From Swiss-Prot:
Disulfide bonds: none
Protein name per Swiss-Prot or TrEMBL: Lipoprotein LpqB
Protein family according to the UniProt entry: Belongs to the LpqB lipoprotein family.
Superkingdom per UniProt: Bacteria
Keyword Phosphoprotein listed: no
Membrane topology: Lipid-anchor
Amino acid sequence: MGAEGGGRRRALRLGAYVGCGAVLLTGCASMPDSGDLRGVESTPRQDAQVRVFAMPPREDAAPAEIVQGFLEALTSDDPQYETAREYLTGDASKQWRPYKSTTVLADGPNPEPERTRNRETGDDFAYTLTGSRLAKVDGQHAYAPDSGDYTGTVHLTLQRKTGQWRIDALPQGVVMGKSDFERNYKSVNKYYFASNVPAGTSGQLGTVADPVYVRGKVDPVTAMVTELLKGPTRWLAPVARSSFPTDTGLKKGVTSLAPDDQNKLTVPLNKKADRVGRAQCTKMAAQLLFTLKDLTPTGVDEVELQRSDGSTLCDLGEAEAESIASHGTGKSGEYEYFIDGEQRLVRLSGSSNGKDPDPVPGALGEGAKKLRAAAVSRDEVTAAGVSFDGSSLYVGSLVSGASLGEAVVHSAGTTEKDRLTTPSWDGGGDLWVADRDPAKSRLLLLQKGSGEPLEVRTPRLDGRIDAVRVAADGVRIALIVERDGKTSLQIGRIERETKADERADVSILELHSVTPQLEEVTAMSWAGDSRLVVVGREKGGVQQMRYVQVDGSTPSGSAPASLTGVQQIAASEDERLPLVAYSEDGIVRLSSGAQWQKVMKEGTAPVYPG
C-alpha cells in the first residue's frame, strides 16, 4: 500500500555535508491535522539519490491518521518496514507479509471510511482502499501488467492498554501508486543459462535475462544476490538453469553485501556450495557478475565466492566471465542491413557516416532474386531473404561467388500481406519465419537454416502472427499478433523436446501481451537482453515509439525521438548501437543523444543480425 500527496506532507529534511557533497534524507510521512481522511495521491518523482524515511504514528492519532500514515510508510526506504509495523497491532504485524506482492495503482490507494462496526463502544473502524490496477509484482519480484478495480479493507481497533488506534487486519503485500513504485523500485536482470538450447556458434553458453523489481535504495546488491540464488522466476524456469546448487544461499548471519573500493564483491555461501568444483564455480561467479554489472554506480569488476568456512571457492573477473558465456555486447553485429532500391540485400557499417551501403557478398547481394525482406545470422555468415512477392524464402551464404539454391519455404497466400513475414535467426543458428496465409497460418523453424521446415506448436495463440523476432538466447520469442483488426505485441517461451527420430518438437508457451495499452502495434525489435523497441498506437491516439520490457513494464529513461510514418524498426541487443528505421523518409538512423538522420531514401526492411 502506498502513499502519495506531496502537498500534505510535512517533509523532514536533514542535510549532512561532507566536503563539497551533501546527503539529503527526506521524510515522506506525516499526519493530517484533522481526522478527515483525504485521497492518497501519487508522490512526484524525486531524485534517485534521495532516501525517504517514514514517520511513526503520533500520540493519540485518529483512525484516519493511522491509515494514511501507514500507507505513506509503505513508500519509504525503511529496509524491513519497521516504521510501517508501528501502525499495526502485535498480532497483525506478525501475520503481515509485505514481500508477498506489490500492487501498482494508477494513483495512490484511496481510503474510504466504512460505517463503525461497533456503534455502542466505537472502538473499531474499517476503511476500504480503492484504485485502478496497473500491475502486480509477485513474491518472486516478477512484474506483470494488470487491469481492473482494486479493493482492499483495512480494519482498526482501539488498544485497551494504550488507548491508541492500531490496524489489526489488512491485505497481504503492499499497494502503492505508479509514481511511488517508480521511485521505490528498480528493474534489474538476473542472469541464468539457457537449458534447452544448443551452444551458439561461438561454442559459448548462452545467458538468459530474467528481469525482477527490487527496492532500489534498500541494499539492492544483497537483494539481487539473494534473488539470483533462489533461481529463475516461474515463467522462465522451464527453459533456464542456474549453476548454483539447489538451496544455495548466503552464509548464516550474512545480511548485507557491498563491493570494496576495488569493485570486488565477496559472497560467503552456505554449505550447499562447499563441494562445488572450479568449473562450476566460475559459472556461478559469471552469473553474479552479469547480474550486478549495472546495479551500482561503479559496477562490480570481480567476484569472490567463499565456502561456509570462509575459504575461497573461486574468484572471477569481468573479462573471464565474458569468455564463459555469450552475453550483452558480445552479441552485437558489425553491420546494419537493409533492402536497397534494386531489391538487393546491402549492408552499412554501424560507424559509417555518409557512406553508401555495399551489396552483401553472395547471391542475395547480386540481385538475382528480388527481395522484400531479409535476416542475417548472428555470426554474419548466412542470410535469409524473402522474395519480393513474399511467397518464397531463400537461404544463402554471405561469401563472394556463393550461389542460391531453391526456396526453403513457400507460402500460398493470395496477397503479399498474407504471405511470409520477415525471418529471424536465434543465437543457436536456427531460422524462424511465419506464414500468414489465412488458410494455413503457421510458425516455421528451420534448424541451422536448412532442411525440412518444422511447424512450431502455438497452443494458446489467439490470432495470426504478423511479425516474428527471436531473442538471441533462443528461449524467448516476440510476436506481433493480429486479431479482429487489432494487433498486440506478445512474448512467448520457446520449449524444445527431441523425439526418437532426433527431430525437435518445438512449442511456444505462455504467450502474454506486453503492450496492453496499445490498440495497434506496427513494428518491433529486440533492443537489449530484456527490452524491445515498439512502434504502435493507443486507441484514438497517434503513432508513437517506445521501449518496453519483456515483462510489460516501462524501462527507466526516455523514449526514442519521435519519427513520422515508421513502418519498420531495427535495434541491436547491444544498446550502444543506433536504432535504424524505415519511414516516409526512407532508411534513417538514431544514435544515442542525437536526432534521426537520413541514411538512404531508396531502402526498406532494416535489420541487425538476428
